[in-house]
Every structure is written in C-alpha cells, then in structure tokens.
C-alpha cells in the first residue's frame, strides 16, 4: 500500500460541565490523502485542496502537527519515517474550538498506521493521540465517533460512550476570529471552591440522562458550568447576545465548544434551524461575521475511505 485516504470528524469538547473529559464527534470533516514519496522527493510536502485563508496557514515543515503525528507512528515502531505527500481537504476551521488539532493528530496517526500495515491497535493509536494532545476530550471522539467520556484510572484510560438521542440536535455558530487554546487556558483559576466542584459534578451527572432521553428539563439544567465558561466567555465577543438569541429561538442551552470561540447550542429538530439563524444574526448584529451549521453527531469517527 502506497496511499491512503482518511476522514476525521470535527469535535465539540466539554459540552458544559465535562471540562477536559467529555467530547462528541460532529458531522463536519477534514480529509487527508497520504501518498508515500520517493527518496528524491521532499521528506514532507503538502497539497491543499480548495485552498482558502485557513489552509494558507499550513506549512510543510517538521513542526506541522499532522506530520508530527505521522512520524510518531514510525518512531513508535522503531522504523524510519518515509517521505510523504499529504493532500488536505480542510472543512474544520483552525483555532475555533472544533478540534482541528485533533483531526490532524488522529488523521496523521491513522494514516501512518495504515501505510505501515496496521500494526498498532485502535487503543494504541488512541493512547498516542491523547499523549500528543495532552487531554482526551477531542481526540477520543474524533477517533471513535459518538459522545465519549474519558476517565484516567491509574495508568490507563476508561472510555465510556454516552447515548446521544437523535432529536438532540447540535448547532454550532462559528465566528470569524480565532481563540487559541493556550489563551483560553491562561484565564482559568488554579483553585476552585467546593461549591463550584459540586455544581459541576451535579450537572455532569445529569447531562447523560438529558442527552439519552431527549429530556428538555434535564438538558436545560445540565448545560451549565462554573469551571471554565465564566472565565472564558469574556474572551468571546458577543457571547451574551448570542446566548440570549439561541435561548429565545428555542435552544435548551448554549455552551462554549472546546476552548472557543465557536458556540454550541442544543435544540429540538424543529427549532435547530431557527437557533442557527438567531445565533448568526446576533453575532452579525454586533459586527462579527459568523456562520452557523445545523449538524449531527458523527457515530463513525475516523474512517479510511
């Protein structure tokens, strides 16, 4: 095998109270075509499919996250890293809180593993992905699909899939400005009050029942948080009016997707289009260009096409 085509979904992490441990895969995808190159060709070259402002930021260097993940597999196997050409079709925007880095990590690992003859198990790939990302909430659902809770137990990970009812519809509103994960983490406190821990524990306990049962009362109460969102919302211009617009249009609630600035609302199918329009309009009303999507939960995760 000299080429492989990999598709990886976007992800939304945290979903309110599940900070750094909960995430879900979304029906928005990046695709990566890996082709082994000859020794006379560059060690790494990029082809950008449908090149736009986002893809112009990517460079074919050894520091490229996609290439680092690709090389990680061969280093793990104790093999030389082959020269490779990678064509990227980018649909997940960069630095927006939709797991773009997770798509690169998982895509690079899965592509390299396939080209090496698939010696690594899915679990081994998952562990490498978590090691590279530093936390599991994006890479685990990006690899496995669905909604996944990741719990570190001793030296291993316990992965618990959550049922997500098909009538709980994710709506994402993506502004045209970026917010780095590093900046979003820098505003978080080092310590929290006991009441804040109890608040989040109760919401995280309620959330899976709301998602599985399509229970509006549970979802409305569960989509709240005191660990990260109160601190990060001030980094996102328009957070309050967008939230108010989403709720007024019928959303159960709204949360920051990952580190932001994308905002995620959950709604009933009949309300989801109205919620999307309301969120986008609210942002545009304060001078922020934005685009909103009514999506689904991607249950497949990463696939080889």
From Swiss-Prot:
Pfam families from the UniProt entry: GHMP_kinases_C, GHMP_kinases_N
Gene3D superfamilies on file: 3.30.230.10, GHMP kinase, C-terminal domain
Question: Which GO terms are recorded in the biological process aspect for this UniProt protein?
Answer: threonine biosynthetic process
Q: Give yes or no: UniProt keyword Kinase.
A: yes
Question: For this protein, what is the EC number?
Answer: 2.7.1.39
Q: Which UniProt keywords apply?
A: Amino-acid biosynthesis, ATP-binding, Cytoplasm, Kinase, Nucleotide-binding, Threonine biosynthesis, Transferase
Catalyzed reactions per annotation = L-homoserine + ATP = O-phospho-L-homoserine + ADP + H(+)
Check the record and name the SUPFAM superfamilies matching this protein: GHMP Kinase, C-terminal domain, Ribosomal protein S5 domain 2-like
Q: What class of enzyme is it?
A: transferase
One GO molecular function term? ATP binding
| InterPro entries documented for this protein | GHMP_kinase_C_dom, GHMP_kinase_C_sf, GHMP_kinase_N_dom, GHMP_knse_ATP-bd_CS, Homoserine_kinase, Ribosomal_Su5_D2-typ_SF, Ribsml_uS5_D2-typ_fold_subgr
Q: In which pathway does it act?
A: Amino-acid biosynthesis; L-threonine biosynthesis; L-threonine from L-aspartate: step 4/5
The principal localisation class reads cytoplasm
Q: Name one GO cellular component term.
A: cytoplasm
HAMAP family assigned to the protein according to its UniProt record, in alphabetical order: Homoser_kinase
NCBIfam families with a match to the protein in the record: PRK01212.1-4, thrB
Q: Which family does it belong to?
A: Belongs to the GHMP kinase family. Homoserine kinase subfamily.
- Protein's name according to its UniProt entry: Homoserine kinase
What is the species listed in this Swiss-Prot or TrEMBL entry? Answer: Picosynechococcus sp. (strain ATCC 27264 / PCC 7002 / PR-6)
Phylogenetic classification of the source organism? Bacteria, Bacillati, Cyanobacteriota, Cyanophyceae, Oscillatoriophycideae
């Amino acid at each position: 095998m000299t080429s492989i085509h990999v598709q990886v979904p976007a992800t939304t992490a945290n979903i309110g109270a599940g900070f750094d441990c909960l995430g879900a895969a979304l029906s928005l995808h990046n695709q990566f075509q890996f082709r082994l190159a000859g020794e006379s060709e560059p060690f790494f070259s990029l082809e950008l499919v449908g090149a736009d402002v986002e893809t112009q930021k990517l460079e074919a260097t050894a520091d490229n996250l996609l290439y680092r993940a690709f090389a990680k597999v061969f280093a793990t196997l104790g093999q030389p890293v082959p020269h490779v050409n990678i064509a990227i079709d980018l649909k997940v925007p960069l630095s927006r809180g939709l797991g773009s880095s997770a798509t690169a990590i998982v895509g690079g690992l899965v592509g390299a593993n396939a080209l090496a003859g698939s010696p690594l198990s899915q679990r081994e790939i998952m562990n490498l992905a978590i090691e590279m990302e530093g936390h599991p909430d994006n890479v685990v659902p990006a690899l496995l699909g669905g909604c996944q809770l990741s719990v570190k137990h001793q030296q291993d990970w316990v992965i618990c899939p959550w049922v997500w009812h098909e009538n709980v519809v994710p709506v994402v509103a993506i502004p045209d400005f970026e917010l780095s994960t590093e900046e979003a983490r820098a505003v978080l406190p080092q310590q929290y009050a006991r009441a804040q821990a109890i608040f989040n524990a109760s919401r995280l306990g309620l959330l899976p029942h709301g998602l599985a049962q399509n229970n509006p009362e549970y979802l409305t109460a569960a989509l709240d948080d005191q660990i990260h969102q109160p601190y990060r919302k001030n980094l996102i211009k328009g957070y309050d009016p967008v939230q108010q617009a989403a709720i007024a249009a019928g959303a159960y609630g709204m949360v920051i997707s990952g580190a932001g600035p994308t905002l995620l609302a959950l709604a009933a199918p009949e309300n989801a289009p109205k919620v999307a329009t309301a969120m986008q309009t609210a942002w545009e009303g304060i001078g922020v260009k934005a685009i909103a999507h009514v999506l689904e939960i991607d249950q497949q995760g990463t696939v080889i096409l």
